[in-house]
Amino acid sequence: VYKRTFLNPAQLFVGSFFLIILIGAGLLMLPRATYSGISFIDALFTSTSAVCVTGLIVVDTATYFTPFGQIIILFLIQVGGLGILTFASYFSYFFRGGSTYENQLVLSDLGNSQKLGEVYSTLKNVILITFSIEFIAAVLIYLSLDEAHLNSNSEQIFFSIFHAISAFCNAGFSTLTNSIYESGFRFNYSLQLIIIATFVFGGLGFPIVSNVISYFSYQFNKINPFQDKEFSSRPWVLNINSRVTLVTTSSITVIAFILFYFVEYNNTLSEHQGLG
């Protein structure tokens, strides 16, 4: 993927984002992407917001963009969430069947890998875990939907995929004008809980999620009666970084929930009942 270059890994990383943002803006300006056209500034802003997963919009994603345009936004969110170099490097490696030593040096710097031999293994795991969680989230979102609020099964599927990816990448984009406060969705608490969980998994980051998955996989294999008796694996524990992150995330979430619940109980939450 990478030949000898004057750019260091940090410059290459930033440059790749500028490139995908410009490409995304160009794609969003295609006639098929919008119903009534879009200015370059609005397209550039939307593309930047999607790639940098900020969730800020200057036009309504639901009514301004066609399904094709929304797919472009979804692609930009996914690439921005994973990092364009993760995509480009891994799939180039996959199709070419190998990598140069210099490529691995660049990627190990970008991915903070301690061993060169683990660079592509790490990239593969990042993509695998990301797509797996997004797939599970999309299925759960689909099962939580009320058919009466979406016109067809294909719309339900697209809605599920879009919001699963948007949630995992912490992007904040929605195909609903008022996001999930939209009438017909604001009281769908199962949908909200699924999106919350997906937000958290995406926000924790790959190293934490990978460590948690490895830990629970090891614990499950220890008690699995169908596991091969010769099963042997390095004992997995939650490392200090994972523990600190999990405790901090849980604590802040619980404290914020309690404060928001009592402060807004008779205001924005007044239309809900109980903990809903």
Residue ranges and their predicted role:
Residues 1-276:
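Membrane-proximal intracellular helices of multi-pass ion channels
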